[in-house]
Amino acid sequence: FTTQDSILDAHENYYYSTEIPKLYLFINFIYKSPEYFLITYILFAFLFINSKDFFINKFELFNYKLLLLILILLYPNLILFFVPFPIYDGMRLFLWTLPYFCLIPGLTIYYLIDNLKFLKVKIIFVLLCLCFFYFFINFLIITPYQYTYLNIFNGKKENRYQKFENDYWGASLKELINKSNLDFNKTIKFATCGVGAQVAKYYFKKKGNHNFRFVSPSDASYIIMTNRVTWNGNFITCFDNFKGTNISKVERNNLILSVIRKID
């Protein structure tokens, strides 16, 4: 299996990338969006019901624009019902929708700022700012791997590697290899899982290490991996499939992104 043949979702379910649930993108939106971001959507629903005139007076043809926005947001989800092509890596293939997803939060924040003279609005705005501050701190902690962000609805941080294929680009591989301290006086046999051997070779050579070979996992002493889904008779993450001792790892906010592991 290639890394795009199967996927892992927030409920620790595995799917073939051609057989993903129709709510796959919605699930990614719920579990990977900032907490304050989701709150603004809930607030907007109440605001639209109770303060619809505010938006109508502020924005020309507001109802039509809102309807168009909703259709744009629904479009990628509807695609999953009709297009047979594989979908993988969360919102990766639908990044063009992100600016549209930001419009509802923008409208909500605009309303709150414009109505700060009211006590209830002030309280809501302060609470929303606290949620944003919580997100922002966590966002900084995971630098430079912001695309691996998972919100609090994913449960314990140390178990979140089982929720999604987090570092699916293998962006942490450079840091992982730079942090490693292996003895290259003798030839080291590496295997990979979830990342390309050629990329690992490049970073090892760039570090000045040349005495190594890449072999199959059964012949390797060490394995370089992310938490991509692999196959050993059943779907399983690379981390869970290959047991051993971590020699080097890249971790952000208690979420392990990649490891070099000595195989037991």
Where are each of the predicted segments found?
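Transmembrane-helix signature of polytopic, lipid-linked glycan biosynthesis machinery
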Residues: 15, 73-90, 137-146
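Signature aromatic-anchored transmembrane alpha helix within multi-pass, membrane-resident enzymes
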Residues: 49, 53-54, 62, 66-70, ...
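Repeat-solenoid scaffold signature
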Residues: 85-120
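Aromatic/acidic, Gly/Pro-rich catalytic loop(s) in extracytoplasmic/lumenal soluble domains
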Residues: 208-264
